[in-house]
Amino acid sequence: MKVSRRNLVVKLGAASVAGAALSVAALPKAFAQGAPAAAAGAGVVNIYSSRHYGVEGVFETFTRETGIRVRFTSGPDAGLRERIRAEGRHTPADMFIAVDAGNLALAATQGLLQPVTSTALSSNIPAHLRDPGNHWFGLTQRVRTILFHPARVQAAQLSTFEALADPMWRGRLVMRPATHSYTQSLVASMIAAHGEARTEQVVRGWVANNPQLIDSDTRILEVLAAGGGDVAITNHYYLGRLLQSNPAFPVRLMWANQAAGDRGVHVNISGAGITTHAQNRDNALRLLEWISTPRGQELFSGSNHEYPANPAAPVHPIIAGFGPFRGDRLDLRELGRLQADAIRLLDRAAYR
């Protein structure tokens, strides 16, 4: 069997979630390439990560500066979380990196992450972007907001996620399906703000507007640019990436829910925690602390046009151009607590 240098696909067997597959990235140069996970004390940290964009360069820099090798296995948040649970004390994972606070919160609730005492992390990561029990820490901020084609929509016509339920947007919306954690966490945040009855009313309004559902934020924006829709909900950094490659990309962003008294735009995180049974705990903590520094933050957030969690870190100039925003200060643990409620609500409202 020929194995590519880039990826080795691992079937999860009994530990898998339906149809999930993970890829073990064979990182170049200083990184292990497909070898078994190193034992404790071997100068390595093993990561299960759903964040895969641009991480190789970040981890290479960490290895050059510390001598600690990084190995990571990539896959979806829920699949990786289930794998850690199934592997129990035998898991090779030292760290779990997720792109959704809800899944980090669920991992902590399931006992998969250990509490960490770190002056550096407490100083570098604001309290609202980390678990109060220090089981996980936000590393970047991901803002989910409203995007539009300026030739067909004026920014003044847009205001909130809830207002997209207005019939004026019938046949004009492009959105992510209910199966994705981005949609689930947005709806969970709305349940926290409004309760289930009001949130279901909004979601039913979205459904009545017959949105085009596409399971890729990049593709959503490309469809918007090509005239296949007028308004979309995506994460901000997808537009940042497209503008990086094409500064004339014809889609604009507006920050949702910014009116006085409103809660602010939906902010999620990519974040990480150290697994309960980590064999290389000290190396994992060193990596977490390194990423939380202004230098680590610039590399980790800038590689994917995300906002740094550390306010002392510089913001990528493209997304700095999006202007200031006020984010929802919801306790991010609520995204995990309300995830199942959000999924049931989406199903009841026939949002697929």
Can you describe what each PLM-predicted range is?
Residues G171-A178, W290-P314:
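Periplasmic-binding protein-like
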Residues M1-V17, P28:
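N-terminal secretory signal peptides and thylakoid transit peptides that target proteins
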Residues A197-T199, E306-R352:
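An extracytoplasmic/periplasmic, membrane-proximal ligand-sensing/linker region
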Residues A107-P115, A127-N134, L242-N257:
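Ligand-binding "clamshell"
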Residues A178, Y182-S185, S189-Q258:
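Ligand-binding pocket segment of bilobal, Venus flytrap-like solute-binding proteins
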Residues T145-R152, V267-N280, L299:
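A bilobed periplasmic-binding-protein/Venus flytrap-type ligand-binding module shared by bacterial periplasmic
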Residues A32-A105:
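Early extracytoplasmic/lumenal segment of secretory-pathway proteins
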Residues T91-F96, Q114-I146, E162, L173-M175:
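A structural signal for short loop-to-beta-strand junctions that line the ligand-binding cleft
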